[in-house]
């Protein structure tokens, strides 16, 4: 029993330290994003397949958009990491989530608007330092590509993370 507690605490500490190091490398410019043209709808579909395909997952995700394809400049790997982090509950969270990723395009502002509704990660925005740092990492990524990142823990439909990407 004590061994399990030590193992769990050690893993949490390691995640925390790794998150701090990652944020530090981002802020110092030591990590460079790949700036490439990507089909955002395809990337979202791949993340949905990954999250919905997890064994014993407590998260089910659906995509709501009228867009068949939409290209934008981003880093494919970091975009994947961004969405997966939003859809991953914290270690001790056993609640079930029916998350929705909504995407719409605003032609006048040349931007894609994303709402990740009922996102498990939005619920823990200020819960612990590790999640706070992960939100900072996510925001850094979105800001790098000219977007906005916002967490709403008390949104009407459920905890929501909203962000934009220029297109």
Specify the residue positions occupied by each region the protein language model found.
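Short alpha-helical segment of the dimerization/phosphotransfer core of two-component systems
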Residues: 8-13
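Helix-loop junction within the histidine kinase core
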Residues: 20, 24-35
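Conserved catalytic submotifs in the C-terminal HATPase_c
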Residues: 34-39, 58-70, 106
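A conserved beta-strand-to-alpha-helix junction within the catalytic ATP-binding
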Residues: 34-49, 80
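Short beta-strand/loop element within the Bergerat-fold HATPase_c
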Residues: 98-110, 117
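Glycine-rich ATP-binding loops of the HATPase_c
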Residues: 101-102, 146-152
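Glycine-rich/acidic phosphate-handling loop/turn and adjacent ATP-lid/helix
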Residues: 112-135
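Conserved glycine-/histidine-rich ATP-lid loop and adjacent helix of the Bergerat-fold HATPase_c
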Residues: 137-146
């Amino acid at each position: 029993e004590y061994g399990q507690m030590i193992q769990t605490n050690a893993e949490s500490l390691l995640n925390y330290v790794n998150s701090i190091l990652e944020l530090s490398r981002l802020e110092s410019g030591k990590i460079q994003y790949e700036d490439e043209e990507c089909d955002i709808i395809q990337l979202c579909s791949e993340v949905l397949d990954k999250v919905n395909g997890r064994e014993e997952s407590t998260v089910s995700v659906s995509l709501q958009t009228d867009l068949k394809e939409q290209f934008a400049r981003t880093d494919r790997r970091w975009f994947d990491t961004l969405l997966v982090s939003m859809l991953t509950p914290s270690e001790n969270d056993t609640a079930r989530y029916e998350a929705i990723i909504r995407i719409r395009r605003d032609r006048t502002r040349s931007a894609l608007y994303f709402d990740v509704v009922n996102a498990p990660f939005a619920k823990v925005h200020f819960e612990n330092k590790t999640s706070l740092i992960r939100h900072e990492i996510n925001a850094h990524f979105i800001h790098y590509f000219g977007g906005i990142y916002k967490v709403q823990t008390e949104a009407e439909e459920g905890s929501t993370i909203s962000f934009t990407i220029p297109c």
